[in-house]
A protein has these predicted regions:
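A charge-rich, low-complexity, intrinsically flexible signal that marks solvent-exposed coils, linkers
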Residues: 1-94
Length: 94
């Protein structure tokens, strides 16, 4: 099975999103290495009881992978919504 082409719509956004992920997951209580923020998925997987390992994880179910990705992505989305609401409230009525 081919791997998806995972590119952000905005060129160069990758580093900023990785920093954002690290910041959000640190606030959630996870130990995040700033040089390897993507590795937080292993800590999340361990907490959820998902046997995620570096390398091939073809033995994992979609549900298991979704639990890990959902925990990380959901936390990021909640923080983006919170930031947007904060910016809108600071802007005031138009």
């Amino acid at each position: 099975m081919s791997r998806r082409n995972r590119r952000y719509a905005v060129p160069g956004a990758d580093q900023g999103m990785q920093r954002f992920k690290a910041e959000v997951m640190r606030r959630e209580g996870y130990a995040v290495d700033p040089n390897r923020p993507d590795d937080v998925k292993f800590e999340v997987a361990r907490e959820l009881g998902v046997p995620l390992q570096p390398g091939s994880n073809g033995n994992l179910t979609t549900e298991e992978v979704g639990q890990v990705g959902g925990k990380i992505g959901g936390s990021m989305v909640r923080e983006m919504i919170r930031l947007a609401q904060q910016q809108l409230s600071e802007r005031g009525p138009q």
